[in-house]
Amino acid sequence: MGEDMEKTMRFGFDKEKNTKHKALLLTIYEALQEKGYNPINQLVGYLLSGDPAYITSHKNARNLIRKIERDELLEELLKVYLERE
């Protein structure tokens, strides 16, 4: 058991999901904006807490956000942020 605790685990995702996630995230962003919320703040609240109550039900956004695993979304966001010039 001690050896297992010393190994670094690998974490990976299916790259094909990226395009689908972007489309869903844009729809969610627009729905939040249309309802007068700050989309970034609301999405951060959701990502930190996992509580879908941070996302409006307008345009079915709350159900859409549940289709994206939070860890996958965080991975994609970090990748884009770190690869920016």
Swiss-Prot record:
The family note in this entry says: Belongs to the UPF0297 family.
Species assigned in the record? Carboxydothermus hydrogenoformans (strain ATCC BAA-161 / DSM 6008 / Z-2901)
Q: Domain of life of the organism in this record? A: Bacteria
> What name does UniProt use for this protein?
UPF0297 protein CHY_0540
NCBIfam families documented for this protein: PRK05473.1
InterPro entries assigned to the protein according to its UniProt record, in alphabetical order: IreB
